[in-house]
């Protein structure tokens, strides 16, 4: 099992990840959102391209 040698190393890695602004953004305009009908149901068609 992997064990960390020091908590300072963990804190440094957490700070590095917290400062990463290039990761997932919830305000992504290209992200597809499912539209729901009045009953709260949604559907999607998945097409596999060759």
Curated annotation (Swiss-Prot):
**What gene, per UniProt, encodes this protein?**
32
GO MF terms listed in the record are: DNA binding; zinc ion binding
Look up keyword Cell membrane and say if it applies. Answer: no
Q: How does it assemble?
A: Homodimer in the absence of DNA, monomer when binding DNA.
Name the species this protein comes from.
Answer: Enterobacteria phage RB27 (Bacteriophage RB27)
Name of this protein: Single-stranded DNA-binding protein
Miscellaneous comment = Interacts with the polymerase and the uvsX and uvsY proteins.
In UniProt terms, what function does this protein have? Answer: Binds preferentially to single-stranded DNA and therefore, destabilizes double-stranded DNA. It is involved in DNA replication, repair and recombination. Binds ss-DNA as the replication fork advances and stimulates the replisome processivity and accuracy.
GO process annotations (BP): DNA recombination; DNA repair; DNA replication
Keyword Zinc-finger in annotation:
yes
Keywords attached to this Swiss-Prot or TrEMBL record, sorted alphabetically, are:
DNA damage, DNA recombination, DNA repair, DNA replication, DNA-binding, Metal-binding, Zinc, Zinc-finger
Matching SUPFAM superfamilies: Nucleic acid-binding proteins
The domain of life for this entry's organism is: Viruses
């Amino acid at each position: 099992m992997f064990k960390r040698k020091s908590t300072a190393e963990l804190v440094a890695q957490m700070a590095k990840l917290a400062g990463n602004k290039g990761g997932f953004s919830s305000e992504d305009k290209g992200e597809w959102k499912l539209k729901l009908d009045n009953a709260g149901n949604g559907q999607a068609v998945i097409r596999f391209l060759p």
